[in-house]
Amino acid sequence: MGLTLGERVQHCLLVLVSGLFLALFRLLSPGTKRPKHLPPITNPLLTLSAVQLAEKIRRGEVSSVEVVQAYIDRIQEVNPLLNALIKDRFSAALLEAARADKLIKEENGGEEVLRNQFPLLGVPMSVKESFGLQGMPNSGGLKSRGKVLASVDAPPVALLKRAGAIPLGVTNTSELCMWMESNNHLYGITSNPYNLERICGGSSGGEGSIIGGGASVFGIGSDIGGSIRMPCFFNGIFGHKPSRGVVSNDNQFPRCSGLQNEYTGSGPMCRYAEDLLPLLKIMAGPTADKLTLSKAVDLKKLRFFTIVDDGGSPLTSPVDRQLVEVQKRVAARLEADLGVTVQEVNFPQLKYSYQIWDTFLALPDKDGKPPEAFVELMADGGSVWPVWELIKRIFGRSEHTVAAIGLALMESSHSSKSSEFILKQKEDLQREMEDLLGTDGVLLYPSHPLLAPKHHHPLFMPFNFSYTGILNILGLPVTQCPLGLSKERLPLGVQVVAGLCQDHLTLAMALYLEKAFGGWVDPGVV
């Protein structure tokens, strides 16, 4: 038994209509001049990892004030082009940097004491606006929440600050953090540092853009369908969605409801692979004990697998040939360097990735309480009628984006009963994937079927996120790794997946792939 006839017809119509509108959009879009990218980085402090900066600051080789000021200067240089950081706290950050420098001068216990107590002392960071950062906006990109300020820090933000990190500000998201382009009617649209005509991804797109543009050392994102991994892929940086239940999702807006907390992962985003593990360890707090992050990894003793696409879902775009080829190059490099065999595998259930993601996000919690409806989040205590919002949008009068209105309309067409076929597909996929990976398996899987699309084009390819979304439902750890640039000078990349609580394996792979393929590339020199 497969999808019902009605479900198949609905999905086919969505794909057909999306394709027709994309063709029309391309036809009517005005031509533009040669795409612009960012100016190159000139300050060498901006090319150091968080680990390196923390060490230099502790040793007095550079002051925290110097580092923070260098990043403020870079933000002021590139943010007018990117629109990634939507509210800064530069004055407060400089005061905190001065206090960090004072603490270092007065510490009698030496560098080791500082390293143990404050591993990130004096290092600047950025924060996704949906996370609570005390005194800063916390709207989730919803215009009606434009004056809402966070009263407390989200737990992972608090842990990073306690470790000595200094927030520079908060970054843009998609409306209600449920779309793959960071655009809303409160802050506007955020661009890709490698090509300003392209999307930066979502919903942690502001983080991806500001970090990829060399204007933040590292940041923090949340991921319910790829919201860390897609921005990291499009912006050429590293990101990690942890195993389920490792990092707290509290004090974020939108809040998780139903079973969404199980499928949402908060994690680090950065330009350098060596930062991933220490950042994850700090963000997880005591829950880090669920993982074996300090365990040494011998890549030669791992088993490697690769999946080249989702099996041909009619809802998703074919995987770009350059992404197929770079994933093959990763497999070949692993075999040559490590003497291992990378086995190509296939899971027929992946063809239903979108339907699985959509079904499981709508399930009630253990007490039978359903998740808060998307349209209720849009209404923010008032009332919203999606059809009326669409009409208003046509005349430029709606406070909501086309993407959010479309999601609300799709939600209203959902069946109240979950498909038994889809429930079984997920159950089978979960079992087979966990059996395959075990405690020593690593899987390569495309990050997205396309390179960073042009602005607004995802509206006509709405299901491509399912390449990342399916892994949220499985709850497995995934590290997004950059793999150089395409012929269009856009980032290439791959997802690296491991078994539950085997995060240390994917983080070790990130270090290997950075060395093998070069890691992050300054977008100003492309």
From Swiss-Prot:
Taxonomic superkingdom: Eukaryota
For this chain, one GO molecular function annotation is:
fatty acid amide hydrolase activity
Q: What are the cysteine partners in each disulfide bond?
A: none
Q: Keywords of this protein's UniProt record, alphabetized?
A: Hydrolase, Lipid degradation, Lipid metabolism, Membrane, Transmembrane, Transmembrane helix
Give a Pfam family name.
Amidase
Q: Which residues cross the membrane?
A: 12-32
Q: Where is the active site?
A: 128, 203, 227
Main location, first listed in the record: membrane
- Which reaction(s) does the protein catalyse, per the Swiss-Prot or TrEMBL entry? N-(5Z,8Z,11Z,14Z-eicosatetraenoyl)-ethanolamine + H2O = ethanolamine + (5Z,8Z,11Z,14Z)-eicosatetraenoate; (9Z)-octadecenamide + H2O = (9Z)-octadecenoate + NH4(+)
This entry's Enzyme Commission designation comes to 3.5.1.99
| GO cellular component assignments | membrane
UniProt enzyme class: hydrolase
Give any single GO term for biological process. lipid catabolic process
* PROSITE patterns found in the cross-reference section: AMIDASES
Membrane topology type, per the record? Answer: Single-pass membrane protein
User: Could you tell me where this protein is found in the cell?
Assistant: Membrane
Family under the similarity heading: Belongs to the amidase family.
What is the official name of this protein in its record?
Answer: Fatty-acid amide hydrolase 2-B
Q: Which gene encodes it?
A: faah2b
